[in-house]
């Protein structure tokens, strides 16, 4: 007879095979049709607000895995905040101006057309290009399961946003923080524009490393009489020979000891601490130190430029070091920030004889018309010919490159517009505001503090087309800038109506009060043609988005981006808000590392180690990406590879199977009718509830601390070890075998229901697709009055009392340890073919002293959790083959085949099988259950 129909076997529509890649789009379609995000916002109107402000990705190209990691991390946080009782809106944004878009539009236009196309036509082409990629990226972000106001995102090309950018700039202008100077800035000769620090990337680059002699005009006899009449040279080191035409000084450290070194018939001056190292590098063995002295008497002396017809002054600078070179630093104020500062102190001429295309101008003498830095070889050859080149070799070092074209950049002195970090104490205020912000990881505060502390003035101007203009109007005759609230209001009015294009389509008169005249008497004015640094665009988002949208607020609770944004968006936002509002635009900042390959190397198409999110989604589904994000410690660089994703997929499968087991065993459970009170549950059931309460507390705390990898670890351990390998394994018998409505079965089902309810709430921020599907299955069981229709409407579970005290905790920890030893003994018996399955076994146990008393007192619990057919105590001396535990002192275990015959229904071996004539295959327990079922059917 087949007793299968008499068992309570699991049934569920929640499939074992997830088919995430096919299933997820259907779930997304349902969320969109229901208006899930809008419903969440409507339901949360009266809740406290939590604003995570989205740092806008660039509207160019398909999203990469770094984008996916960032967006999923944000979504996990926002979903967890909603489940914690907050109103947590998400307004995604896009950065739409700037060089990368203009660069690609130029390529589409071609060489000839890009030079002749009218400015408004080119701006229209750039706007069209940005919108094209927004339309491409939006569904790619939504496919990740990211909830947000995708129908009304913020775009930096929206007219209202462009007007806000101009307003913020004009606040700086009116306050006196905006200045125009000719000073060295990063310059890309390929893109022909100035660059901000945040637009510069560092890559390995090969440069010539040369040592050059500068002839001293007057001997050093007053420094040391021994040097009288010597043919003396100051030796400098540089890796940028092309800047030598701009040299106006050689810098010494005022406190260093310097040496006059005899080399042949010449005397060379360099730092004493570097003499030996220098001579070894240049291969000179025959030398002697004639004199040592401090630099005090060297200041304001002159040496002769090695090839230009002028002198170079000897000056002091604290940034001179003895880490490399000679301690005598080539100084060109037109080609370096430190050099420029030194030049200001000494009144040196700021020479920068290089045009925007990187071509030497006539001021470069014999090198005029030549390209930088190709001219390096000519300069080196000329130095060698004149006898002033000491040594030359090539070195590989980290060098600044343009973020767009990836070509090396230069420092070049040009007239530019800057936000002064000193005017209005901007630097001081920004540094103070940094200290008021919560930084995660904590080292982020020191990082951005040191950056702001040492950063130069912010170069705002860009010599390009696609961006918001520098809304500066100045007198044609005297150059005085018009600073007027009335002008600002007119700019704002036109920008709100027509966008920033208005600056280029309207004459200057449309922005000025009627009849406006300069203080010099001139009535002719000109508009600035440069555009703003794109970092000012995104840095103004707190004003353009958070302050203007009804669903947001400034300052935001959290900014979350990659750690590179300490010198990018975080810093531009901080400076902009500090300069116009006096406070930081964020209360907290969280940063994550870069996404790298499995070996920790940067992803590169040329190397072939790029993992595209689209490929991962097609193979595994977005859920696996979400689980991967939560499994990694985002504070460091995050590794990803096919092997890692497969491991994550395996981990997901275990969690899913646990959920499926729960649902399968709840198929006949109606929580409104079948629930059993905690007080009526067995200790095992209450132990399981205690473990879930422990998990709930740990996970909710981890969400609050943004420690998502800890959540992942907790979920995996709970599902795989606590539940599947222990509790679920033990209660399988009561779930399948006991009477359908028996108290012991309904009690365990109550535990399963409550744990699953809470588990789905806890995992929903991470495994959103799976939680949504499983919740629908749970919702169908009944109790609809108390259960939210969507898991995303449900808050995290509240604390429960499992009625499981400290004494019980201690006892069960000990029981589980003993059970672990019994399992080892069963494994050995299985290996030796004594038994097959543990249900075939009789376990004989002996405990010495107090252990024996404990085992005797907990006999029923130990019997229950061991999953064997029989258990008895060892009488007398144990057999030689018995297992002696090393973990539990005094414990001896012996295993043998249990007496009796295997019951066809519960598979437990029992001596009562065969006692019934009608059901000879059943044990006495199963017989009673089946007879009860027959009676119920008859009734």
From Swiss-Prot:
CDD domains tied to this protein: Anticodon_Ia_Ile_BEm, IleRS_core
Record-listed E.C. numbers: 6.1.1.5
Keywords recorded for this protein, A-Z: Aminoacyl-tRNA synthetase, ATP-binding, Cytoplasm, Ligase, Metal-binding, Nucleotide-binding, Protein biosynthesis, Zinc
Protein biosynthesis among keywords: yes
Main location: cytoplasm
Record's catalysed reaction(s): tRNA(Ile) + L-isoleucine + ATP = L-isoleucyl-tRNA(Ile) + AMP + diphosphate
Positions occupied by motif 'KMSKS' region: 602-606
This protein's record includes keyword Cytoplasm: yes
Biological process (GO), any one: isoleucyl-tRNA aminoacylation
Motif ('HIGH' region): 57-67
Protein name: Isoleucine--tRNA ligase
Organism: Desulfotalea psychrophila (strain LSv54 / DSM 12343)
């Amino acid at each position: 007879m087949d007793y299968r129909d008499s068992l309570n076997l699991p049934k569920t529509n929640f499939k074992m095979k997830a088919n995430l890649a096919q299933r997820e789009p259907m779930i997304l379609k349902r969320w969109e049709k229901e208006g899930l995000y809008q419903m969440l916002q409507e339901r949360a109107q009266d809740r406290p607000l939590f604003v995570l402000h989205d740092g806008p990705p660039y509207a160019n190209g398909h999203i990469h895995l770094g984008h996916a990691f960032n967006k999923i991390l944000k979504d996990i946080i926002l979903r967890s905040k909603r489940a914690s009782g907050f109103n947590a809106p998400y307004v995604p944004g896009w950065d739409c101006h700037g060089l990368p878009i203009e660069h690609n539009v130029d390529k589409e236009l071609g060489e000839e057309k890009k030079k002749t196309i009218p400015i408004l036509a080119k701006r229209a082409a750039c706007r069209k290009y940005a919108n094209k990629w927004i339309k491409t990226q939006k569904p790619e972000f939504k496919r990740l399961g990211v909830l947000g106001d995708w129908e009304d995102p913020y775009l930096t090309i929206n007219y209202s946003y462009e007007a806000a950018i101009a307003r913020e700039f004009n606040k700086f202008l009116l306050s006196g923080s905006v200045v125009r100077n000719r000073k060295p800035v990063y310059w890309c000769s390929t893109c022909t524009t100035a660059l901000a620090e945040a637009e510069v990337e560092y890559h390995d680059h090969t440069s010539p490393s040369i040592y050059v002699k500068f002839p001293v005009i007057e001997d050093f006899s007053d420094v040391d009489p021994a040097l009288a009449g010597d043919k003396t040279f100051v030796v400098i080191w540089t890796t940028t020979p092309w800047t030598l035409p701009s040299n106006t000084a050689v810098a010494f450290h005022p406190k260093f000891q310097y040496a006059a070194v005899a080399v042949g018939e010449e005397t060379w001056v360099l730092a004493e601490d570097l003499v030996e190292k220098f001579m070894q590098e240049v291969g000179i063995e025959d030398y002697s130190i004639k004199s040592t002295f401090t630099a005090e008497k060297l200041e304001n002396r002159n040496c002769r430029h090695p090839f230009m017809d002028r002198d170079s002054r000897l000056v002091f600078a604290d940034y001179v070091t003895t880490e490399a070179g000679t301690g005598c630093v080539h100084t060109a104020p037109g080609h370096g920030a430190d050099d420029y500062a030194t030049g200001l102190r000494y009144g040196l001429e700021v020479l920068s004889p290089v045009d925007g295309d990187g071509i030497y101008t006539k001021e470069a003498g014999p090198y005029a018309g030549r390209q930088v830095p190709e001219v390096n070889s000519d300069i080196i050859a000329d130095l060698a010919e004149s006898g002033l080149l000491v040594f030359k070799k090539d070195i590989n070092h980290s060098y600044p490159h343009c973020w767009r074209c990836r070509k090396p950049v230069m420092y070049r002195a040009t007239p530019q517009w800057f936000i002064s970090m000193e005017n209005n104490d901007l630097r001081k205020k920004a540094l103070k505001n940094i200290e008021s912000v919560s930084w995660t990881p904590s080292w982020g505060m020191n990082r951005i503090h040191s950056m702001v502390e040492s950063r130069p003035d912010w170069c705002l101007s860009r010599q390009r087309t696609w961006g918001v203009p520098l809304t500066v109007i100045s007198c044609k005759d005297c150059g005085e800038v018009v600073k007027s609230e009335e002008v600002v209001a007119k700019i704002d009015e036109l920008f709100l109506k027509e966008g920033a294009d208005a600056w280029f389509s309207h004459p200057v008169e449309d922005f000025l009060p009627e009849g406006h005249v300069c203080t010099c008497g001139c009535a002719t004015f000109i508009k600035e043609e440069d555009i703003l640094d794109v970092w000012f665009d995104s840095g103004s988002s707190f004003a353009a988005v958070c302050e203007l949208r009804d669903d947001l607020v400034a300052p935001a609770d959290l900014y979350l981006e990659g750690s590179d944004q300490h010198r990018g968006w975080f810093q531009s936002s901080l400076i902009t808000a500090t300069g116009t509002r006096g406070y930081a635009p964020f209360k907290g900042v969280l940063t994550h590392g870069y996404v790298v390959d499995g070996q920790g190397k940067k992803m590169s198409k040329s190397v072939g180690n790029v993992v595209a999110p689209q490929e991962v989604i097609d193979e595994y589904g977005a859920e696996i990406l979400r689980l991967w994000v939560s499994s990694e410690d985002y504070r460091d660089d995050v590794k990803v590879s096919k092997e890692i994703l497969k491991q994550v997929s395996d981990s997901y499968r275990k969690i899913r199977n646990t959920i499926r087991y729960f649902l399968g065993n709840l198929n006949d459970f109606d929580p409104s009718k079948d629930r059993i009170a905690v007080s009526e549950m067995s200790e095992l059931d209450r132990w399981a509830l205690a473990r879930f309460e422990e998990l709930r507390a740990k996970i909710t705390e981890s969400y609050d601390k943004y420690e998502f990898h800890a959540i992942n670890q907790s979920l995996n351990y709970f599902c795989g070890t606590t539940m599947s390998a222990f509790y679920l394994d033990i209660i399988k018998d009561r779930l399948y075998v006991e009477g359908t409505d028996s108290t012991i079965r309904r009690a365990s089902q109550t535990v399963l229901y409550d744990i699953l309810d809470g588990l789905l709430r806890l995992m929903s921020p991470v495994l959103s697709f799976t939680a949504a599907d499983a919740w629908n299955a749970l919702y169908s069981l009944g109790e609809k009055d108390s259960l939210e229709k969507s898991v995303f409407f449900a808050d995290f579970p509240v604390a429960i009392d499992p009625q499981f005290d400290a004494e019980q905790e201690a006892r069960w920890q000990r029981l589980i340890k003993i059970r672990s030893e019994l399992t080892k003994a069963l494994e050995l018996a299985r290996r030796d073919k004594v038994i097959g399955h543990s249900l075939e076994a009789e376990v004989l146990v002996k405990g010495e002293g107090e252990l024996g008393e404990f085992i005797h007192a907990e006999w029923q619990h130990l019997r229950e959790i061991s999953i064997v057919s029989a258990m008895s105590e060892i009488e007398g001396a144990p057999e030689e083959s018995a297992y002696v535990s090393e973990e539990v002192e005094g414990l001896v275990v012996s295993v043998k085949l249990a007496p009796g015959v295997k019951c066809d229904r519960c598979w437990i071996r029992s001596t009562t099988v065969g006692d019934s004539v009608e059901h000879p295959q059943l044990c006495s327990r199963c017989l009673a259950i089946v007879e009860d079922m027959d009676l119920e059917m008859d009734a």
